[in-house]
Amino acid sequence: VSKDLKRGSSFLRATSSATVLWHCVQIVAATLVTLQPELVAAKQTNVLLIVSDDHHWADYGFMGHEHVRTPHLDRLARESRLFPRGYVTSSLCCPSLATIITGRYPHQHLITCNDPPEQRGVGRNTPDGRRLFIDGRERMNVHLEQTPTLPAMLAQSGYESFQTGKWWQGHFRRGGFTQGMTRGDRHGDEGLSIGRTSMQPIYDFVSHCRNDAKPFLVWYAPMLPHDPHDPSPDIVEHYAQCTQSKHIARYWGNIERFDRTVGDLLDFLDRENLSKETLVVYVTDNGWIQSMDKPGFAPRSKLSPYDGGLRTPIMLRQPGTITAGRSEAHVSSIDLAPTILAACGISPPPSLMGVNLLDESKVTAREEIFGECFTHTAIDLEHPEENLMWRWMVRGQWKLIVPATADGNVHQSAAKRWEARLVDPSSLEKFENAVVELYNIAADPEEKENCAVSHPDLVSDLRKRLDAWWKP
């Protein structure tokens, strides 16, 4: 450096001060690049993963709902690569969330149900019942620990990660998070306060990461719009003018409540000048059709193989990096882990079956997506086929649904297993009599007309593809 500075002095006698200044800047910059490359290294992408809970795919302003107010989600959609025809792999919270965090199907990560098996005649609130439940949940937690997770993979590249909201698999560290709110309860204990009482834990975590110059992943999975549907009275009053059902008004109100928290997060990123450095990802864990005359969900939504339980918009936003726009391609929550890893400069493991949604060639080349639905309470924690209710796939305009009882090769005694679990007779009869279903979801988005009988060759072709995918 000293020799260069002496040369700079000779330039001073022969040239203008402006020229000298320019040469000095070049010398200093070259020295810094040589000695301190970390000063000019590109910043790593941060990730904010937003997961709503029990949310129907059409209940957003940007998806065309005429009553539900979602201005902040609408903004996110405008600024995102939007996939309105997204799907989750399973229509139940626990297995769906496990897929999002691992990038693997439920039959791969083995978390197929919400709760572990029950024993005939043993209530969960009895000492024996509680022991069975705790032991079963521990086995489910171990399954997750044995599967690489998104936070664990990011940690290898120096990322800090923060779990908030819904989290079923024990202490947050068991999922690979470096920090978190959940200590081990079924839904998420302390984590469930996020979005309902405060957003401050997220702001504090991000500030901590900035102070330590660490890239971060935030898992924001509030129990919203999931029940209890208890929005503020003014919101309920507004929606009461739009529907005769108080239950629907409260559900819609919880969606608006969730939307406001999304606005809080986007505004926070703007204030902290983090928007361009942060990939924002949105998905819901499963669908929901609110019952009109009682709390709870209506048929053909949660826990079902229909779009009311499976479909979700998926959004990816990073201003200056991702071009906003809309894609009508069918995509899946199985794609989120490889997409996030790729956006962070990390090669996804070959074992992940999803595609990078930011690679248009891979999105358009894929011809079908797959999924599976299981019982709410497990029958067997080690063998996914024991809990299977339906397998399904989407290829082009067609959606195939295959009940477990319709496939002897996969599940010969499904009905007997259901009977052993003491399901009510009407449910067992309905399941035993289930048939293969085929829907043209482009022309029949509500899946009302089963075309399976009139298209036997198509059903046969799709069944072969579904069987080739299903490898428990």
Each language-model region and where it sits:
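Histidine-centered active-site microenvironments of extracellular/periplasmic hydrolases
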Residues: V68, F268-G325, S332, M353, ...
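Active-site His/acidic residue clusters
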Residues: I202-Y251, N286-P299
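Polar, surface-exposed loop/tail segments
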Residues: T70-P71, I100, K166, K276-E277, ...
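C-terminal, low-complexity/hydrophilic appendages and adjacent surface loops
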Residues: L303-G308, T375-A452
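A short beta-strand-to-alpha-helix junction
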Residues: H65-R69, Y87-L92, P117-Q119, R139-P148, ...
